[in-house]
Regions:
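C-terminal alpha-helical "lid/dimerization" subdomain adjacent to the S-adenosyl-L-methionine
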Residues: 153-206
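Conserved alpha-helix/loop element of class I SAM-dependent methyltransferases that forms part
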Residues: 34-51
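Class I SAM-dependent methyltransferase SAM/SAH-binding core
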Residues: 54, 61-106
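A conserved beta-strand element that flanks and buttresses the S-adenosyl-L-methionine
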Residues: 117
Length: 229
């Protein structure tokens, strides 16, 4: 279903991952996140063979087909607090695939994970709580385990931040959104999606015990970061 949620000129409520968003989410994220399919392919490649993967904030489980195409043996647990997202994710069936409804702030019970993924999820959690979560997730991994974080980040330099925002809006217009839709969604996300700098995440990964930290994906204000314990 095509995303037309923000066409209305009426006052928009704050953004939430409800049924209306779930219904159009796959279209929305592919039009709003640059190179999203390629990004999922990169994440799947980083997972590696024989992995036990926890996908935190898994939404509709879009990573699963990429894992299936690449690996014959893996275990996957997807967790999301949106019931409608979890219900839609159930389409990705498999004996080694499990989806759970749960709030990351209530804690996650891990069972020997080798890879933990936070794909565009920490940005929806208050910045004051993110470092503690990263510490917890890194602590749950064995030596050599991977924490993969993908975020929409902000720049320290305000002029550069505005230049990147302009480029991002150009991308969304090229993908069929009107400027009015873009503005309406920005308003709905204000205070809901709060970006931090890439330095913030790299510092948090280092403090949590990552021995190797690298950026594997970057497009203006979107970054994929890898921490290896």
């Amino acid at each position: 279903m095509q995303d037309k949620l923000f066409e209305t000129s009426q006052k928009m409520p704050k953004f939430e991952f409800n049924q209306a968003v779930t219904d159009v989410f796959d279209d929305m994220i592919n039009r709003c996140v640059p190179f999203y399919q390629h990004l999922l392919q990169q994440v799947a490649q980083l997972v590696g063979r024989n992995a036990t993967v926890y996908d935190l904030g898994c939404s509709t489980g879009a990573l699963v087909p990429f894992l299936k195409r690449r690996y014959s043996n893996f275990n996957y647990v997807g967790i999301d607090k949106s019931r409608s997202m979890i219900e839609k994710a159930q389409q990705h069936v498999g004996n080694n695939i499990q989806f759970l409804e749960g709030d990351l702030l209530d804690g996650v019970v891990f069972d020997q994970p080798t890879v933990i993924i936070c794909n565009l999820v920490l940005q929806f959690i208050h910045p004051s709580q993110r470092k503690a979560l990263i510490q917890t997730y890194m602590g749950a991994l064995p030596k050599g385990g991977k924490l993969i974080i993908v975020e929409k980040v902000r720049q320290k330099n305000e002029a550069l931040q505005q230049e990147y925002k302009k480029s991002y809006h150009e991308l969304k217009r090229a993908n069929g959104y009107s400027q009015a839709e873009i503005d309406h969604k920005d308003h709905a996300l204000n205070g809901i999606l709060v970006s931090e700098t890439s330095e913030f995440y790299c510092d948090a990964l280092g403090a949590a015990g990552a021995s190797t930290i690298d950026t594997f994906f970057k497009w203006y204000n979107f970054e994929g970061m890898l921490g290896i314990k």
